[in-house]
Amino acid sequence: MARFVVVALLVLLSLSGLEAIQHAPKIQVYSRHPAENGKPNFLNCYVSGFHPSDIEVDLLKNGKKIEKVEHSDLSFSKDWSFYLLYYTEFTPNEKDEYACRVSHVTLSTPKTVKWDRNM
């Protein structure tokens, strides 16, 4: 019984220690297919390597939040950091700018990464 209590306490201590670890998110913005003006595509924002799990991600068109956005389930890597994919349909053209804005406890202000059509 005492052995079980010690093991349980060690597990609880290790889990509580995970909350103290903080890692800033890595943000990648890309399209599913090479960009062609006037051709429908998908805009993706892959956010990875962050901890804790609370995060806010917005896809932007000309600085304004895109409302019709979907995302994957929150998942975690072997190192217990988290990752997500946000995506939406879009049709690129010469004038519109697209970006991904992320808010996380590790960032003093939200970070915005622009989509580069040549990537």
Curated annotation (Swiss-Prot):
Oligomeric form and interacting partners: Heterodimer of an alpha chain and a beta chain. Beta-2-microglobulin is the beta-chain of major histocompatibility complex class I molecules.
Keywords: Disulfide bond, Immunity, Immunoglobulin domain, MHC I, Secreted, Signal
Domain of life: Eukaryota
SUPFAM superfamilies: Immunoglobulin
Parts of the chain that traverse the membrane: none
InterPro entries: B2Microglobulin, Ig-like_dom, Ig-like_dom_sf, Ig-like_fold, Ig/MHC_CS, Ig_C1-set, MHC/Immunoglobulin
GO biological process: antigen processing and presentation of peptide antigen via MHC class I; immune response
SMART domains cross-referenced by the UniProt entry: IGc1
First-listed, main subcellular location of the protein, grouped into a coarse class: secreted
Signal peptide as annotated in the record: 1-20
Location in or out of the cell: Secreted
Annotated Ig-like C1-type domain residues: 25-114
Matches recorded under Pfam families: C1-set
Record family assignment: Belongs to the beta-2-microglobulin family.
GO cellular component: extracellular region; MHC class I protein complex
Disulfide bonds: C45-C100
Function: Component of the class I major histocompatibility complex (MHC). Involved in the presentation of peptide antigens to the immune system.
Protein name (record): Beta-2-microglobulin
